[in-house]
């Protein structure tokens, strides 16, 4: 079985829009957005072709670059994997830096070295969250991993090398950032059967499934409901990844930890900025709150 067929069969089983014919509003929305998805597909395919043919050339940084990304809009566990990889490599003795995009922040053009006091409006929420996760444990050497926020990852990468002597640069959400040459492309796919292979804006895919051919490593996040990929006839290694909640952090005191069992039996109000929040909701439900 090919990777494309495998993913199309497994991912499309229970996407919310799979009940289109039971939800007239969803049908109308999808139909209205489909022409824009065709246009988006043309733009994405043309851009990828230019890079594949070498007509557009990526910039090369004087360091090893690892990209961690996805082909959908959020909910794949990309950020936790960035944090894990940064901690792991740093503890192995590598000088590591994380390059975040700083979406919807003031760091689109200038490089911001994130600190605990950096306003989220300056660096972006993901960059600040990555920094705080890297610095949450006082005993971890990963407190010394710098996080740089800038839409221009080449620019922030040069600063990471010159200012911190970084040997390894981890690019958060870098799969579509083809302007930058990378040593390894890690792509996460959601394997909880929540997404259909429709491109934005009619669906949740940023690229077609065929783009996975560019990946060096594919990680299936929380693959409890997906058949094993061990027998897939593909060149890329496919790994299974699970995530679980271990602790809570008060927003006003990010360095203080609260036991995760505090959720059990409590009335919980949850909100998030994840593109596909179904996994977050299921995770909270598994912690047995009295009301969510």
What do the predicted segments below correspond to?
Residues 66-85:
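Glycine-rich phosphate-binding P-loop
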């Amino acid at each position: 079985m090919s990777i494309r067929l495998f993913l199309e069969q497994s991912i499309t089983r229970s996407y919310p829009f799979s009940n289109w014919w039971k939800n007239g509003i969803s049908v109308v929305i999808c139909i209205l957005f489909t022409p824009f998805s065709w246009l988006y597909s043309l733009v994405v395919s043309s851009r990828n072709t230019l890079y594949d043919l070498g007509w557009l050339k990526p910039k090369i940084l004087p360091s090893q670059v690892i990209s961690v990304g996805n082909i959908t809009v959020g909910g794949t566990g990309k950020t936790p994997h960035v944090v894990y990889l940064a901690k792991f490599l740093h503890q192995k003795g590598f000088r590591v830096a994380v390059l975040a995009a700083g979406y919807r922040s003031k760091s689109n053009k200038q490089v911001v070295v994130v600190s605990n006091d950096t306003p989220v409006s300056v660096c972006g929420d993901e960059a600040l969250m990555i920094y705080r996760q890297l610095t949450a444990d006082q005993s971890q050497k990963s407190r010394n991993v710098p996080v740089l926020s800038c839409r221009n990852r080449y620019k922030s990468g040069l600063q990471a090398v010159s200012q911190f002597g970084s040997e390894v640069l981890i690019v958060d959400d870098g799969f579509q950032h083809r302007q930058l040459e990378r040593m390894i492309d890690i792509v996460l796919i959601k394997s909880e059967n929540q997404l259909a292979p429709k491109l934005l804006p009619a669906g949740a895919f940023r690229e077609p499934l065929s783009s996975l051919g560019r990946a060096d490593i594919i990680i299936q996040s929380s693959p409890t409901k997906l058949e094993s990929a061990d027998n897939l006839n593909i060149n890329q290694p496919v790994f299974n990844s699970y995530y679980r909640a271990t602790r809570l952090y008060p927003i006003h005191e990010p360095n203080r930890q609260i036991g995760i069992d505090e959720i059990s039996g409590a009335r919980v109000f949850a909100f998030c900025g994840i593109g596909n929040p179904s996994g977050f909701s299921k995770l909270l439900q598994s912690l047995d709150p009295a009301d969510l």
